C-alpha cells in the first residue's frame, strides 16, 4: 500500500532527470517485522469490480512484499460525439508487483523489484484502417514489464546506491477490431547515487544516470542515449536555516547537451504556539521530444500541421515562494506563490487531433496556492486548498482545460472510537477554456465515503462519487461519470 505521497513543484531535474517539471513522490509501505497483508474486494456502478491482495514479511536479514490487483469496469459512453454506437467504453487492468530485499550486513542491502501491468481500454473517435473513415469502435491494449535491481552500501560518512532498471512496453491500437497502430518500446538505465556527510550540517549528493530508450512501430525504429550527471550541496545551519544548491548536466544523443540548476531554502521561526516556515525554490529544466512523439508525427495517422512539425527540445524555468505555519492546536496554514515557464512547449493538438505540435515562445503558469488543515477535535478534521492559476500559451491565449480557480474542501469524522470513519470532499472548478478560447462550464463535484470495522482487521467500506449527479465536462465532448456508488470488504492481518 501507499504510505506517503509528496508533491514537489517546479523543475526537479537533479535526481529525477532534467525533464522532471514536477514530481509526485509515492512512498510505499515497508512491512513491519513479521508477516502481514490484506485482501479486498469491491464493486459498484458501471459494472465496476476490483479485487486486490498483498502480503509482506520483514526480519533483520530482509523483507519481501507481493501484491496483485484486478480492476475492470464496463464504463460509459466516453464521448458525446458518439451518437451512433452509443456503446459503453470499458477498461480492464491487471497488475502484479513484487519487492525483495536482503540485508547480509548492517551496511549492505540488495533489492529486487518486478512489476507487470496489462490493460485494455475502449474509447471513441479513431479512424478505420482501410478507408480512414471516422469510427467510434476503438480500443487499445497495453502491456508493460519492468524490473529493477539495486545495491545500497554505507561506509562511514559515505553512502552509495547502484541500480539497473529495465522496462518493456507494448501498445497496440485497434479500430473496428483491426490493428491500426502498434509500438514496442524499451528503456534501460544504470544509475548511481552517492552522498558524503562532510559535517553534521553539510551533505554532498552526487550521481549519474545513463539511459537508453528505443521504439519500433513497424516503420520507425530508433534508439537514443541520454546521459546525466549531477551534484548537490545540502546544508543545515543551526536548527533554523536549510539550503540546497545543485547543478545537472545532460547529454542527449539527438538534441545535444544542457545544463540545469536548482536552488532551495527554508527558514524556521518559532511563532506563538507553533512554527513559521519560509521556503522557496528556483530551477531550470530540459526535455527532448520523446521517441513516441516523433514516431507519431511521422506515422500514418498524423496529418498537417503536426506531420509538418519538426519537434525540438523544450526548456523550462520556475520558482515558488511560500510561507507555512504549524500550530500546536492542530492548525496548519500555507500560502505559496508559483511561476513556471516553458519555452517551445510540446503538446498534443487537441483542436484538430493532427498529432504533436510545438509552441513558438514561452508558455506560463503562475498564481497562488493556499492550503489549510485543522483538527477541530480529536475525532474531527477539516482541510481545504485553493489554487489560482493564471496561464498563458505562447500565442498569448489562456492554456486550455486548466481551471483558473480550483478548490477542494474535505472533512473527516471518526466517531465510535474510530471504528467508524466518515469523509466528504467537495471539488470546485472555475474558468477553464476550450481550444477555441470559449469558456467551459464551471462545476462542483461532491464525493462521500464511509468505512466501519466489523471485527479486528475486517472492515466494510463504501463511497459515492459525484453524489449530486453533476453533469460536467473536464474536456469538451468527453463525458464524465454520473452519480456512482461503490462498496467493498477489506481484511488486514
Language-model regions, residue ranges each:
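Face-selective signature of the C-terminal outer-membrane beta-barrel domain
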Residues: 101-119, 139-273, 331-337, 381-383
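Non-catalytic regulatory/gating segments with a bias toward low-complexity or hydrophobic composition
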Residues: 5, 24-26, 66, 280, ...
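A beta-strand signature from Gram-negative outer-membrane beta-barrel systems
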Residues: 1-36
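Conserved C-terminal beta-signal and adjacent last beta-strands/turns
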Residues: 54-58, 67, 103-105, 110, ...
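Surface-exposed extracellular loop regions of Gram-negative outer-membrane beta-barrel proteins
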Residues: 118-120, 126-129, 219-222, 253-258, ...
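Gram-negative outer-membrane beta-barrel transporters
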Residues: 236-243, 333, 338-341, 359-435, ...
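Membrane-embedded beta-barrel scaffold of Gram-negative outer-membrane proteins
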Residues: 62, 68, 73, 152-175, ...
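Periplasmic-side early beta-strands and strand-to-turn transitions of outer-membrane beta-barrels
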Residues: 14, 25, 32-35, 40-42, ...
Amino acid at each position: 500500500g501507499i504510505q506517503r505521497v509528496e508533491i514537489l513543484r517546479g523543475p526537479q531535474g537533479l535526481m529525477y532527470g532534467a525533464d522532471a517539471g514536477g514530481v509526485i513522490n509515492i512512498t510505499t509501505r515497508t512491512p513491519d517485522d513479521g508477516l502481514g497483508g490484506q485482501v479486498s474486494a469491491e464493486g459498484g456502478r458501471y459494472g465496476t469490480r476490483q479485487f486486490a491482495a498483498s502480503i509482506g514479511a520483514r526480519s533483520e536479514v530482509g523483507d519481501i512484499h507481493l501484491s496483485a490487483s484486478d480492476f475492470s469496469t464496463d464504463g460509459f459512453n466516453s464521448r458525446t460525439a458518439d451518437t451512433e454506437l452509443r456503446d459503453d467504453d470499458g477498461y480492464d487492468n491487471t497488475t502484479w508487483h513484487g519487492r525483495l530485499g536482503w540485508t547480509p550486513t548492517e551496511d549492505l542491502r540488495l533489492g529486487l523489484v518486478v512489476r507487470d501491468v496489462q490493460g485494455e481500454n475502449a474509447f471513441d473517435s479513431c479512424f478505420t484502417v482501410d478507408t480512414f473513415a471516422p469510427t467510434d469502435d476503438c480500443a487499445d491494449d497495453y502491456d508493460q514489464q519492468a524490473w529493477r535491481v539495486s545495491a545500497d552500501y554505507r561506509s562511514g560518512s559515505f553512502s552509495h546506491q547502484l541500480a539497473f532498471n529495465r522496462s518493456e512496453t507494448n501498445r497496440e491500437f485497434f479500430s473496428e477490431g483491426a490493428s491500426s497502430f502498434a509500438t514496442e518500446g524499451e528503456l534501460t538505465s544504470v544509475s548511481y547515487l552517492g552522498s558524503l556527510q562532510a559535517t553534521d550540517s553539510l551533505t554532498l549528493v552526487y550521481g549519474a544516470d545513463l539511459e537508453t530508450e528505443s521504439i519500433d512501430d513497424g516503420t520507425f525504429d530508433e534508439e537514443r542515449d541520454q546521459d546525466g550527471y549531477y551534484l548537490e550541496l545540502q546544508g543545515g545551519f543551526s536548527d533554523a536555516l536549510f539550503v540546497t544548491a545543485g547543478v545537472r548536466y545532460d547529454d542527449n544523443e539527438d538534441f545535444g547537451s544542457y545544463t540545469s540548476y536548482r536552488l532551495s531554502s527554508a527558514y524556521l521561526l518559532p511563532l506563538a504556539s507553533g512554527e513559521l516556515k519560509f521556503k522557496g525554490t528556483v530551477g531550470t529544466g530540459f526535455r527532448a521530444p520523446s521517441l513516441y512523439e516523433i514516431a507519431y508525427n511521422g506515422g500514418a495517422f498524423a496529418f498537417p500541421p503536426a506531420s509538418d512539425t519538426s519537434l525540438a527540445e523544450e526548456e523550462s524555468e520556475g520558482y515558488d515562494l511560500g510561507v507555512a505555519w504549524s500550530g500546536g492546536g492542530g492548525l496548519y496554514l500555507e500560502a505559496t506563490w508559483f511561476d513556471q515557464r516553458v519555452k517551445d512547449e510540446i503538446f498534443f493538438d487537441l483542436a484538430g487531433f493532427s498529432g504533436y505540435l510545438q509552441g513558438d515562445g514561452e508558455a506560463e503558469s503562475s498564481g497562488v496556492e493556499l492550503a489549510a488543515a485543522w483538527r477541530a477535535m480529536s475525532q474531527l478534521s477539516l482541510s481545504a486548498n485553493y489554487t489560482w492559476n493564471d496561464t498563458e500559451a505562447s500565442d498569448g491565449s489562456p492554456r486550455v482545460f486548466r481551471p483558473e480557480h480550483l478548490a477542494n474542501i474535505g472533512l473527516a469524522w471518526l466517531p465510535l472510537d474510530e471504528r467508524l470513519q466518515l469523509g466528504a470532499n467537495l471539488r470546485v472548478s472555475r474558468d477553464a477554456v476550450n481550444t477555441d478560447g470559449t469558456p467551459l462550464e464551471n462545476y462542483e463535484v461532491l464525493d462521500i465515503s464511509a468505512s466501519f470495522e466489523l471485527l479486528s482487521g475486517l472492515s466494510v467500506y463504501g463511497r459515492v462519487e459525484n453524489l449530486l449527479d453533476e453533469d460536467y465536462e473536464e474536456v469538451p465532448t468527453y463525458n464524465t461519470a454520473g452519480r456512482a456508488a461503490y462498496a467493498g470488504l477489506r481484511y488486514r492481518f
